[in-house]
């Protein structure tokens, strides 16, 4: 129990989310973003591709009004710094053409911040405006960073967005001119509107989960399996004990987290094992300090000096795509989670 609690701290999970998989599907945008940022094992492909280390997606909560969109962003953590906010709506293709030949094929779409709830006429503030074709369909993305920053600072100011459509030909506002995809009932629409926040967690996460071979966690065998085949283990018998990297697979299903972690199913943290005896070869990636320490130990110049330690000296980040405790989908990057190289230090 203590080991699993420690693991939750490493992954910055305060409350375990409910099991929502497989009946609830994540937004395709978030799945595509994960695949762009990480490989199938969650390891970062290209550092710096994302703004910040957390991407949060919130689905539209308004079912009845075709043009009103509301997002509950209360899952944002204290101290989290928002870098960018995107309002993503899927514009549906108009199926019926106008009978009059002189009607133009474009309309103006305007996005407003609602300043009050339920007031008539609606008090609103214009955020963005653009021309769109009536007969095309696809995602429209609006930068709403300034507005959402205000909502984060004061949650009471969040009354959602309103979209209006104005026909360019005669400047008459027609609310049914263009429709946007809305989730209907229990069945989730893959094209449902999203509010996507790119943030920095501003947390110095506790020491990453790359345990040594003698750690308490691995001794308890708490949902971590060491695969028998070592990764890049030296072949000759004289080198077997030298510092090297071995596999250490963290299985989220075995831990009991597979009901809310979307990707990956688990990951290979790897760990370092072996001795750092003099002479330290180039393959041991030894520091100058470690080299001197191994010499002092070998010459027995000091009884108190031990051999250098075999530890990770190169680490990569891990990406998790998961449902939080309010069933919002989050993509989070965790630094220094995978040992890619071992050395004597």
PLM region descriptions:
Residues 1-345:
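Secreted, disulfide-rich extracellular signaling modules
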């Amino acid at each position: 129990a203590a080991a699993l609690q420690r693991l939750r701290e490493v992954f910055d999970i305060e409350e375990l989310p409910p099991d929502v998989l497989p009946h609830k599907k994540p937004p395709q945008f978030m799945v595509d973003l994960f695949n762009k940022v990480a490989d199938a094992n969650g390891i970062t492909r290209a550092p710096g591709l994302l703004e910040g280390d957390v991407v949060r997606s919130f689905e539209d909560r308004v079912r009845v009004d075709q043009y009103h969109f509301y997002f509950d962003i209360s899952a944002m953590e204290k101290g989290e710094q928002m870098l960018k906010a995107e309002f993503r709506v899927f514009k549906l293709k108009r199926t019926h053409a106008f009978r009059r030949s002189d009607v133009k094929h474009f309309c103006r779409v305007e996005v407003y911040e609602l300043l009050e709830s339920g007031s008539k006429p609606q008090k609103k503030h214009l955020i963005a405006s653009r021309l769109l074709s009536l007969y095309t369909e696809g995602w429209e993305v609006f930068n709403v960073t300034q507005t959402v920053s205000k909502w984060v600072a004061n949650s009471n100011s969040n009354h959602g967005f309103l979209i209006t459509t104005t026909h360019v030909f005669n400047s008459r506002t027609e609310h049914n001119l263009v429709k946007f995809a809305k989730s209907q009932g229990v069945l989730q629409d893959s094209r449902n509107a999203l509010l996507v926040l790119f943030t920095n967690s501003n947390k110095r996460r506790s020491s990453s989960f790359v345990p040594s071979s003698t750690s308490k966690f691995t001794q308890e065998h708490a949902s971590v399996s060491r695969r028998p085949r070592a990764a890049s283990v030296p072949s000759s018998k004289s080198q077997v004990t030298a510092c090297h990297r071995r596999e250490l697979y963290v299985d989220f299903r075995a831990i009991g987290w597979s009901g809310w972690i979307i990707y990956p199913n688990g990951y290979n943290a790897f760990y370092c094992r072996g001795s750092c005896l003099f002479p330290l070869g180039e393959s041991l990636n030894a520091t100058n300090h470690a080299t001197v320490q191994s010499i002092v130990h070998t010459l027995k110049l000091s009884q108190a000096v031990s051999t250098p330690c075999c530890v990770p000296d190169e680490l990569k980040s891990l990406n998790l795509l998961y449902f939080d405790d309010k069933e919002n989908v989050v993509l989070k990057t965790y630094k220094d989670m995978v040992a890619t190289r071992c050395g004597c230090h």
